[in-house]
Each structure stands twice: as structure tokens, then as C-alpha cells.
Amino acid sequence: MLLGALGGCAPRQVVPRPVSGGLNQTFVLRVGQTATIRDRPLEITFKDVFSDSRCPTGAMCIVAGEVVMLLLAQVANNIKDITFHVRPGGDAHEFAGYTIRVTQIDPPKGPPETMIAENQYVAYIQVRAGKATSPIPISPTTPMISPSY
């Protein structure tokens, strides 16, 4: 009888509520949260944060670093895991006729001795119909072309 009473005291896992976003509008997702795009068959879920190499507060860094995160995108039976490398300026990928852009990740990286819990991460996302029209962020493997004088 005591075991049955204790079973009711187990902590419950909190599942974030789904959100609704619109095309060409910024919406916010937490890890585990799903957004449906109004009047479209597209759903986006913020699945995971793999790494966070952003420059810590108060540090002098040569590069800004990035957050590597996973979104799951779905239109009907077309489902795809998409890995984003979010640097200053964001990262964008095309899926099923849409451009999905992660523009920012919060919270900012704190001092080196502090850790950000996975449930604290927030992604700012924009969805557009069609292909990306703005420049794609430069990846570390993309050669940079210097102007010649």
C-alpha cells in the first residue's frame, strides 16, 4: 500500500505546449516544443541541442562559435531531421518548399564556469515559402574570397 502511495509522488515530465507561427513571422520554440505554421501543413519541433561553442561572457574569442541544434520538420509523411549550425546571422535550410531559418539562440553563453541546461535553450525561427532569398551564412568549409586591389 505504501508503494502505491509513493508512486504518485514521482516527478512529472513537463511537455512544452505547442505554438502556432505564421509565414514570415518570428516565433520561439523551446527544446521539445512543436510549432504548426498557420494555414500550412508544416510542423517544426525543436528536438535537441548537440553543442554550444559560443564565446562565453567576458571572454576574448577569435571566433564567435555556434550552437549546433536539431529540428524535426514535417509535411504530411515527409519527415526530416535538420541540423542547424547557428552562428551570428543564423542558419537556414530548405525543406518541402519552405525555407526554415533559425535567427538566434538564447540564452547567451554565460561565464565559462556556468552551464546552460537543455530546457533553457530557446530558438527564434522564421519560415518562408520558397527558396531562401537572403545570403546563406558562410560555413567553415566555404572558402572566403578576398577582393583584389
Language-model segments: which ranges?
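Mature extracytoplasmic domains of secretory-pathway proteins
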Residues: 50-87, 91
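Short Fe-S-cluster ligation motifs
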Residues: 85-104
